[in-house]
Amino acid sequence: MLWRGWAMERILLFFAGYLEGGQPGPEQRDLPICIPVATQLPHAVGLAYAAQYRGDDAVVMAYCGDGATSEGDFHEAMNFAGVWHVPMVFLIQNNQWAISVPLKKQTHSRTIAQKALAYGFPGLQVDGNDLLAVYAATREAVERARRGEGPTLIECVTYRLGVHTTSDDPTKYRSTEEVVEGRDRKSTRLNSSHHTTSRMPSSA
């Protein structure tokens, strides 16, 4: 949000529960933050369709979590995006848990990325802890959309270490061993990504 130009005070207001905090400034090309899960996705497809209709080079990006992919709005948005061939990128943060529901109880699909194939456009899975991998996948998806090749879904696989909300107690539904394993896996990948990035200038 900071990178997109949101003022820090607006972000803090949002997390403090003030309505004003979720409103982007008039100069920003963002929509207000949606609290109901997945409701932003059909709106995003509509914006992408409008951009396509106007003939400009805008690409719409919509973000959601793995839990949102179990909502009807997700599938409706995916269907319209595929049918209309809109310039859009669906970016899914798959952190393995939708509050207290694990991914294996949300879907029988091997990946979330493969769901895109049913709607007629590509889906790919990347390591969500690898900044460079996420950047490369997103850049290619945006360029693809600008070439008129339609939408893309990117599944960023990671792990939620903390609580879902301040009223959440994850110890009631997942083991300490699982959290430790998830933490170690994230640390290893983050360190690997950092070392690769650090070597880039000297190896160029």
Positions of predicted regions on the chain:
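Cofactor-binding active-site loop characterized by glycine-rich and histidine/acidic residues
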Residues: M1-W84, P102-H108, A113, A118-G120
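Acidic, glycine-rich active-site loops and adjacent beta-strand->loop/helix elements
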Residues: M1, C64-S70, I92-A98, N129-L132, ...
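Conserved thiamine diphosphate
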Residues: Q52-D56, S109-E140, E181-R189, R199
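Single conserved hydrophobic/aromatic residue that forms the stacking wall/gate
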Residues: L190-A204
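Structural motif
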Residues: V59-Y63, V89-L91, L153-E155
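Glycine/aspartate-rich loop-and-adjacent alpha/beta segment that forms the canonical ThDP
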Residues: R144-R189, R199
